C-alpha cells in the first residue's frame, strides 16, 4: 500500500482513540471544530498557522500511481547509460494513455555502470529498479564513476528551467490587479480587476513585487552587516490553478503563505507559461552509488537525482550516496512527493553550498515523507528564496548533521517540519541548532530573514536545538517540540515567536499535515448551495491528441453533469451525467470524440459550475 495512503488510514483509525487519551492540543490549532476539524486562531497582526494539505503529488492526499512496466533492461558489460537511455526514449515515444501515463522502464536487479546522465524528458515516464538495498542479487544499483558532475538521474528539461521558470509569464493576457486591501495567510479567494480575462482552469501566478515599502516593512531583510535586500529582486509569487471565477472573485487550488497588503505592495495575477512542464514522472526503487576518491572529494556528481520543471512527480524508495550537493533536488517544480528515500554519506568539504541532502529550489507544494539523511550540513532545506513555499517535511530523520534543516535564505514561506527526528546532536548552542526558522543575518549572500510563517510540529530532537524567531510582518511557530526550543538565534535575541508545549508529550493531532489533509477531504456541510466543495481538475493531457481525461471532486453525494462546449458556446459532447458520491471521480472522452480545436469542460451541480479550457490536436 502506498506510504501516504497508509499514513492517512492510520491517522483516521487512531483519531478516536487519541481523542480519548490524555493528550493536549495547541491553543492556536485545535481539533475542536465540526467532525474534529482543526480550528485556527489568528494573532493581532493576522498571522496564523498555515494550511499545508495541498503539498505533494496530485495536490496532497493522493496515492502515488503504480505505473505498468513496458520496457525491461538488464545489466551488461561496460557502460549501461546508452541501453537504459534507449529504453527511456522508447517509452517516451509511446502515446500516453487516458491518464497521461506512457509506462515504466524497469531495471532488473544488478549493478549498472552509468557514466552519463539518465534523462526523463517526457510526461508519463517512470524509471524503476528492483530495490534500493546493497545486494545486486535483489536490488538495482546505479554506479557512477569518474569526474562527471552532472546528475545521475535528471527528470525534466533543464534547458527550459533557467531562472524562475515556475513563475514564467505567458504574455497572452493582461495582468489583473488584486482589489482586496489585505489578502490573509491561508486565503484561496480574493477579488481582482478584469476578472473576465480569466477562466476556471487557467494556470496563473499570484505576484507580490518586492517594493521599497515591503523591504522597509521587513527591516531591509534583516541582513546584519550585509546590504539590504534590493527593490525588485525578490518577488513573492505563487503558481496556482484557478478553480473558479465568479464575478470579480477568483478561487485558487491552494492557499497563500504570505499576507498581501495592498498599501505595502500592490499585487496582481497573470497567466502562467507552462511550456516544457512535464507531469506524472517518477524514479523508484534504485540505489545510486557515486564513486569518489575520498570523503572530501568534489569531482564527482553534484546531485544524484534532480527534478526540474515537473508537476505531479515523485521519487520513491531511492537511496543516494556520495553526492556532494544533494541526494534529491527539486527545482522549479510543483506537486512533487519524495518518500521513503535516503540521501546518505555525502562526500565533500564541510562548508557552504554543500551537503543539502534533500533540497527544494524555487518550488512549491512539495512533500518529503519518511526519508533519511545522514552527514548533512542542511539535511532538509529550501534554497529558492521567496519562491519556495508550501514545503512539508513529514516523518523524516536526520543523522549527524553539522548544521540546521531550514528555509535557507531570503523569505521562504510556509515550511512545515512535522514529526522531524534528529539524531546525533553535537551541541545546544545557537551555532548547533538543528532546525532553524528565523534570521540568518549576513550569512551567505545576505540571507537575512530566511523563513516566514513556518512551523515545527511535534519534533523529536533528542538533545538537538530548535531555534524559532519572529520576522517582521509574519510569525514562526514551534509547537510540541520534544527537546529545546529557543527564541535566541545567532543574530537576534529579542523577537517574539510562538513557542508552545515544549517537552509536553501527547500533542493532538500527531501530524498537522495529515490532519489537514483529512479535514480537506471531509464533506463540507451547510453551504448555501447544498453542494459543498466542488472542484474540476485540469483536463489531462492538455493539449490532447488522443483520449482526454477529466477529474472532479465532490464533497457530498450530488447529481453532477460534465459537458463539453465549443468556442461558440454550443454543447458538443457529454462526458458524464448522474449521481456521484463524495470524493474524486474521473470521466474520459475517447480519441476521435472531438474535432481539433479549443473547448471548455463545464462541471455543473445544481446552480454551481466549474469550468476548464482544453485543446484537441490532430
Give the positions of each predicted feature.
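Right-handed parallel beta-helix
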Residues: 124, 129, 202, 210-239, 243-244, 279-369, ...
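A short, polar/proline- and glycine-enriched secondary-structure boundary/capping micro-motif
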Residues: 260-266, 326, 349, 379, ...
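Glycine-rich beta-solenoid repeat tracts in large extracellular/virion proteins
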Residues: 117-121, 134-169, 191, 271-276, ...
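Positively charged n-region of N-terminal signal peptides that target proteins for export
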Residues: 1-4, 618
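Extracellular beta-rich repeat passengers
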Residues: 172, 406-519
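C-terminal outer-membrane/trafficking sorting elements
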Residues: 529-540, 544-618
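Extracellular "leader-to-stem" segments immediately downstream of a signal peptide or signal-anchor
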Residues: 6, 11, 16-294, 476-521
Amino acid at each position: 500500500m502506498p506510504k501516504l495512503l497508509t499514513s492517512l488510514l492510520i491517522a483516521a483509525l487512531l483519531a478516536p482513540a487519541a481523542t480519548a487519551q490524555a493528550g493536549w492540543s495547541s491553543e492556536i490549532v485545535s481539533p475542536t471544530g465540526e467532525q474534529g476539524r482543526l480550528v485556527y486562531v489568528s494573532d493581532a497582526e493576522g498571522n496564523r498557522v498555515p494550511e499545508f494539505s495541498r503539498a505533494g503529488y496530485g495536490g496532497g492526499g493522493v496515492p502515488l500511481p503504480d505505473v505498468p512496466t513496458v520496457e525491461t533492461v538488464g545489466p551488461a558489460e561496460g557502460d549501461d547509460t546508452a541501453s537504459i537511455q534507449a529504453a527511456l526514449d522508447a517509452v517516451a515515444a509511446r502515446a500516453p494513455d487516458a491518464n497521461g501515463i506512457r509506462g515504466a522502464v524497469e531495471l532488473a536487479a544488478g549493478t549498472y555502470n552509468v557514466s552519463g546522465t539518465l534523462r526523463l524528458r517526457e510526461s508519463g515516464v517512470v524509471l524503476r529498479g528492483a530495490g534500493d538495498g546493497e545486494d545486486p542479487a535483489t536490488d538495482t544499483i546505479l554506479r557512477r564513476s569518474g569526474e562527471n558532475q552532472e546528475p545521475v538521474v535528471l527528470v525534466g528539461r533543464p534547458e527550459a528551467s533557467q531562472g524562475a521558470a515556475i513563475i514564467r509569464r505567458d504574455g497572452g493576457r493582461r495582468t489583473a490587479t488584486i482589489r482586496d486591501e489585505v489578502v490573509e495567510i491561508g486565503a484561496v479567494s480574493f477579488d481582482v480587476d478584469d476578472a473576465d480575462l480569466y477562466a476556471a482552469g487557467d494556470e496563473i501566478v499570484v505576484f507580490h513585487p518586492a517594493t521599497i515599502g515591503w523591504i522597509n516593512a521587513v527591516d531591509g531583510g534583516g541582513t546584519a552587516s550585509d546590504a539590504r535586500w534590493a527593490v525588485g529582486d525578490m518577488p513573492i509569487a505563487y503558481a496556482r490553478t484557478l478553480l473558479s471565477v465568479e464575478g470579480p472573485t477568483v478561487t485558487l487550488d491552494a492557499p497563500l503563505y504570505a499576507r498581501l497588503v495592498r498599501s505595502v505592495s500592490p499585487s496582481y495575477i497573470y497567466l502562467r507559461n507552462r511550456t516544457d512542464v512535464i507531469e506524472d514522472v517518477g524514479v523508484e526503487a534504485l540505489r545510486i552509488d557515486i564513486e569518489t576518491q575520498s570523503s572530501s572529494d568534489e569531482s564527482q556528481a553534484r546531485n544524484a537525482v534532480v527534478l526540474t520543471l515537473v508537476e505531479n512527480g515523485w521519487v520513491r524508495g531511492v537511496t543516494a550516496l556520495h553526492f556532494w550537493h544533494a541526494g534529491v533536488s527539486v527545482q522549479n517544480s510543483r506537486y512533487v512527493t519524495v518518500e521513503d528515500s535516503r540521501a546518505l554519506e555525502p562526500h565533500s568539504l564541510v562548508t557552504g553550498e554543500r551537503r543539502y541532502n534533500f533540497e527544494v529550489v524555487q518550488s512549491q507544494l512539495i512533500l518529503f515523507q519518511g526519508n533519511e539523511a545522514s552527514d548533512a550540513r542542511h539535511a532538509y532545506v529550501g534554497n529558492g528564496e521567496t519562491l519556495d513555499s508550501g514545503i512539508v517535511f513529514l516523518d523524516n530523520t536526520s543523522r549527524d548533521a553539522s548544521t540546521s534543516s531550514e528555509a535557507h535564505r531570503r523569505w521562504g514561506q510556509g515550511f512545515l517540519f512535522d514529526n522531524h527526528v534528529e539524531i546525533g546532536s553535537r551541541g545546544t548552542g545557537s551555532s548547533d541548532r538543528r532546525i532553524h526558522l528565523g534570521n540568518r543575518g549576513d550569512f551567505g549572500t545576505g540571507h537575512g530573514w530566511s523563513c516566514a510563517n513556518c512551523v515545527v510540529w511535534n519534533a523529536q530532537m533528542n538533545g538537538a536545538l530548535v531555534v524559532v524567531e519572529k520576522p517582521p510582518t509574519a510569525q514562526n511557530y514551534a509547537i510540541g517540540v520534544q527537546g529545546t526550543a529557543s527564541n535566541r538565534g545567532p543574530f537576534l535575541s529579542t523577537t517574539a515567536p510562538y513557542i508552545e508545549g515544549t517537552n509536553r508529550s501527547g500533542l493532538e493531532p500527531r501530524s498537522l499535515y495529515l490532519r489537514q489533509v483529512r479535514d480537506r477531504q471531509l464533506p463540507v456541510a451547510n453551504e448555501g448551495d447544498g453542494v459543498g466543495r466542488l472542484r474540476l481538475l485540469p483536463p489531462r493531457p492538455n493539449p490532447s491528441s488522443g483520449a482526454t481525461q477529466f477529474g472532479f471532486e465532490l464533497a457530498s453525494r450530488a447529481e453532477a453533469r460534465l459537458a463539453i462546449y465549443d468556442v461558440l458556446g454550443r454543447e458538443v459532447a457529454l462526458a458524464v451525467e448522474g449521481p456521484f458520491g463524495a470524493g474524486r471521480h474521473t470521466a474520459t472522452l475517447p480519441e476521435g470524440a472531438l474535432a481539433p480545436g479549443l473547448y471548455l469542460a463545464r462541471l455543473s451541480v445544481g446552480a454551481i459550475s466549474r469550468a476548464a479550457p482544453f485543446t484537441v490536436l490532430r
